[in-house]
């Protein structure tokens, strides 16, 4: 997708806004909230420019510790999967864990960290 409208239209998506602070090893380093994350560099990505990353709920995970701190505001077991809503700064992010029996289940109010692979997001 080349816009937030299209990305949201073709399925559920999270949008995180950040500024490119570096380009290294084929990745862009974006300042998101209070930390920096690596993403696959978009074509013509430029240091100093603002970007939005599109993160699908199934492309993210939660870990006990990490750079991108978040707070769980919804944790809902759905049988075959676990739905989460977390706050990253002031941004609500929705996640789906399709293999919850092999992962820790986070409860509402817990602090943890959002994680994703650099190539697991799309940069707008």
What are these regions (language model features)?
Residues 1-10:
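Conserved beta-strand-loop-alpha-helix hinge in the C-terminal portion
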Residues 13-124:
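Non-catalytic connector elements of ABC transporters
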């Amino acid at each position: 997708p080349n816009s937030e409208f299209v990305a949201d239209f073709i399925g559920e998506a999270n949008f995180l806004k950040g500024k490119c602070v570096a380009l290294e090893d084929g990745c862009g380093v974006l300042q998101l909230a209070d930390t920096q994350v690596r993403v696959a560099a978009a074509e013509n990505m430029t240091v100093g420019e603002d970007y939005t990353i599109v993160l699908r709920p199934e492309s993210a995970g939660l870990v006990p510790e990490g750079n991108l701190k978040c707070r769980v505001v919804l944790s809902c077991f759905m049988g075959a999967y676990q739905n989460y809503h977390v706050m990253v700064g002031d941004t609500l992010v929705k996640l789906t864990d399709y293999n919850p029996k092999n992962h820790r289940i986070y409860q509402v109010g817990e602090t943890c960290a959002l994680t994703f692979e650099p190539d697991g997001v799309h940069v707008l």
